[in-house]
Amino acid sequence: MSETQKENPYSSTVLLPKTDFPMKADLAKREPAQIQSWKSGQIFRKMKEQRKGKKEFVLHDGPPYANGNFHLGHSLNKIVKDIIIKSKSLAGFYADMIPGWDCHGLPIEVQVLKNLGKKARETGPEELRRLCRNYAEEFVGKQGEDLSRFLCFWEEDRIYKTMSPGFEAKIVEVFGELFQKGYVYRGKKPVYWSIDLATAHAEAEIEYYPHVSPSIYVKFPIVGEQKKFCLIWTTTPWTLPANLGICFNRKIEYSFFKTESGEELILADGLAESVTSTTGVSLNKVKSISSDELSVLKFQHPFMDRISISLFGDHVTLDAGTGCVHTAPGHGQDDYKVGLAAGLEPFSPVDDYGKYTDEFPLMQGKKVFDANPEIIQLLKDKGLLLHHSEFEHSYPHSWRSKKPLIFRATPQWFFKMDFNELREKSLSAIDGVQWIPSWGITRIRSMVETRPDWCLSRQRNWGVPIPAFTCESCGQTHIDDVSIQFFTKMVREKGIEIWYSEKAADLLPPGTKCGKCGSDSFKKGNDILDVWFDSGVSSFAVLGERKDEPPADLYFEGSDQHRGWFQSSLWPSMALRGIPPYKTVLTHGYVLDEKGHPMSKSLGNGIDPTADVIQIYGADILRLWVSSLDFRDDIKVGKESLKIVSEQYRKIRNTFRYLLGNLDGHTSEQNLPFEELEELDLFYLSKLSQFAEDVIANYEAYQFHQIYQKLILFCTVTLSQDYFDMIRDRMYCDARNSKTRKSSATALQYILETLCILTAPILSFTAEEVWVSNGKKDSVFLQNFPDLKFWKNQNLEEKFESVLQVREVVQKALEIARQENKLGKSLEAGLEIVSKNGTNLTKILPKETLEILFVVSQVHEKNPGLDVLSFYENEKFSVKVLKPVQVECPRCWRHTEDISKEGDLCGRCKSVVG
């Protein structure tokens, strides 16, 4: 208010907004107390108990690794899950989510070894496992604190950890059931192998980075021929010692090509020009050679006393190389398959640490990548190297060590993808799952269609042991249903440490004998299960079973989980249940910096959700930021974008504050019945109904960014700019118990309660604070989304909207008058409004209502001779701003005809003041 009004003798009679709800949020300071209030009041538990017997909605939480603090991506993931659970609960569902943590595996073991430093070499396996368990427990606690701070609702005594004895036992049990049904086998196949970590890797543990490899063209001499060779191309010279054949494609045409030196080379016709371009060697076609002729050829290995045979496979293409593919069944998936068909055993003269064994004595003990230059020199010395250059390409690396991987054949435990038509059944089931975004189905289908058998075993310390034994007499592997069940019971009681603390005989049922030789002497295996198998069986360990339908309604994780958790969860569920574990799969993109780069400590571009957001702005700002994102795509974020969201929050908070202030002295019990409400208030309740309907639909579709946009628009335009402006006069100047004021107060009460409930899943702290400030005793989370369809009034909306389209023209006309210093407050103005199509606005709404809508003192169909202050028109209406002849009421500032002289009150204000 102006200084003039402060001195106004009537200022104390004006009902200005009054509330203890602070304009300054101070969220960072206030929120912890609210968290304690929710915990002590057991609100989450009550929320679920209140909805027992209602339709169930289960969101299965994908477990993050228990290492390191939560980053912004974790925050996004967990907050979206929290929004979903709360919105489903408010929609009437029995909604539940049990937070979980992935506690075994390489990420934790490697970090513990790193922390040990030089002491790592002195640390035994038992002590290492103890340290890993302690480390995981520590970060479950730390991440749990983060979770409480921004997630709000979860029960700390109701979580799952993959290292708990019950969960570990379920892992062994599911492995046993899969083994019993024939899905698990032991075999020697090429797998991704980390020579730095000395263990196999699953496809989900692989990252691709640019890598420079040697590109060489090698001549394999044809046995029994002079100066005739088969030309192969490879970027892995180190695999040549394991070469057992050369692979062709029967659909490709091959020929002998003569070089300038007189040598003849076999290669694909379609690649001759490319080879010449790359190598600079001129090639002249001599004659074609058929597939039958190729099949009988044998080739001398370039530097081993061994013959390589002809093979055929559809994986050979004309995309690159020579069309003649160097084949080492021990070092490649396609190589293994064609070799298996030809009866070739996978041969890999490389040990766990990537060093050649005595099977390649020439370079025994040398690391394979270090051997590349020596092998190239060896080929050059023998005159079998046609060309050598460097080749940059995308190459698989370990997700943990960030070092290049190799393909290496080792004895491993595998899950059969094609047993019992599992792949076909899984693809069919995928079609029945709802994938959001829709492209998710294409991504996972392509991966499931081509995925090789899943390598389940790892050669590390920290994980669930595979309960397999080896007969000490004959070397036969022993594992069966009885032994697995026996061991499962032991794990359930004492955890996986029992595998290491007990002798083999004590881990097997009494009387166990080798099925091959009858011996009762066994030794324990050293393999542990892939950590992806741990999380993959979480639907069995954590969720209840439902008859003939998936146990989870929703999985929500990053889009990288199409090749990770979504698959590792799918396979066991399809094999044992015959259905997928989820009905719907929703994914989010990566959180990137403002320039689209991944966030990292080394780049210094990260945003810490606790230090940079919660401790400065509060958790509700972080939650509002998450809701503002279309998280289905990658998300760019910087500190500036958080400031913008903070500003938008301030507008929302001020809307709540204005509502509370105007409701001072008015409670829900004082609301007027529907039939007594003013048309203007009914119109905005109709708009509230549509707003609520849209928001609830957006929650249902997980389109929270649209809720954010609608909320900002509703608060800043529909309410603050329009409705609050229109009813300010009656709320401030009408008698407290007047029908018009109570009508608007009733509408404001409905708006406040509805906004509180609708925003609670996102602005959880603020919504609860407002709810309590409005005198409510129970939590906002014990309410339901309101059904406001009865407020919907299409006829009333059409009626008001037809008039409100003039409001924009009026405001522009008023602004012109202000800019020309002819007008201060809009109440100092009268209006002449002329419709160019002949519409008479006073026939649609009473003149008094039009004055309220336009926030002016008078509205005329025709200027009664008043001075014109400004003029504005569009194609439908023309508006003149007029200067009223009446003086201003000193209390309400309106210029009305019932004021006799300056300083007198208008009739309405006289009756109020008395």
Curated annotation (Swiss-Prot):
Binds 1 zinc ion per subunit. IleRS has two distinct active sites: one for aminoacylation and one for editing. The misactivated valine is translocated from the active site to the editing site, which sterically excludes the correctly activated isoleucine. The single editing site contains two valyl binding pockets, one specific for each substrate (Val-AMP or Val-tRNA(Ile)). GO terms for biological process: isoleucyl-tRNA aminoacylation. One of its GO terms (molecular function) is aminoacyl-tRNA deacylase activity. This is Isoleucine--tRNA ligase. Coiled coil: none annotated. L-isoleucyl-5'-AMP binds at residue 557. Its EC number is 6.1.1.5. The gene is ileS. The lineage of its organism: Bacteria, Pseudomonadati, Spirochaetota, Spirochaetia, Leptospirales. It is an enzyme of class 6 (ligase). Keywords: Aminoacyl-tRNA synthetase, ATP-binding, Cytoplasm, Ligase, Metal-binding, Nucleotide-binding, Protein biosynthesis, Zinc. It is found in: Cytoplasm.
